[in-house]
Amino acid sequence: MRQKPIYVEIEMKSDLDTLWEYTQNPSLHKEWDLRFSNITYLNSQPCEKQKFLYETRVGFGLKVSGTGETVGVFNKCSSERSSSLAFGSDHPLSLIRHGSGYWKYIQRENGKMTFLTQYQYKTAYGLLGRWIDRLLFRPLLGWATAWSFDALRLWVEQNKHPKRFIRSAIIYVFMCLFFSLFWFYQGFAGVKTSILTGTAEIGLAILWLLPLKRKWIIHGVQACIFAGFACLGSEIFMWVLLSVFSAASGALSLQLPSARRTKRKRKK
């Protein structure tokens, strides 16, 4: 049951030195990477690999901690750099026991940077740990890496701090949950009078729970539906408010980082 390594690649407008600073400086790295709550570099000799401690908050006041070491390889005259790392944890809440990977930086002729990572790890807790990793943890970790890379891109390109996106993303999730519950309620109530209408409304409720690629289309269609209800003259204020709410949340979704803007498979 060997799993494929996690691979993420993104292109952004930047120069080599700037991107290197944003990713190799621990005080900046922890700001954009969802995988880490804190990164602390330990004292080391110039000829040694840089050792570090990391922490990740997992909720309910709990943290997972681990250690690692990294080394950067670059030539001032080259348009490429790389950074390798090894990491591990003996924390009882950590599903990762040890792993390794690398970051690679490639300066393109069009003034853009290609930033990519690939890493692999071994899990704890035997067969149970491997199944949890396969079904839940690895997909979530891959998504978090990809989302973080796009958050980094927006920070570098537009100077928008990643913490702002995290708050906005939480708000957006609650918006989607609100619309989903709204249509579930409408669907289960409406199915008594019209099975077709009730089923369609329940289907729309399910769509709000899915990570769809072009979800802004649903926002737009829903805003038009609410506006149409308002034109019918019944509870005008409520429908207008819901229409504006739907359009505003759609606009918000277009400004958020997205894992879909990254490449998750290496070119053959």
Curated annotation (Swiss-Prot):
Q: Which UniProt keywords apply?
A: Cell membrane, Membrane, Transmembrane, Transmembrane helix
How does this chain sit within the bilayer?
A: Multi-pass membrane protein
The UniProt entry lists the main location of this chain as membrane
Annotated localization = Cell membrane
Keyword Membrane assigned: yes
SUPFAM superfamilies of this UniProt entry?
Bet v1-like
Which residue ranges traverse the bilayer? 169-189, 190-210, 225-245
- One Gene Ontology cellular component annotation held by this UniProt entry: plasma membrane
Q: Does the keyword Flavoprotein apply?
A: no
Name of the protein described by the UniProt record: Uncharacterized membrane protein YndG
Q: What organism does the UniProt record list as the source?
A: Bacillus subtilis (strain 168)
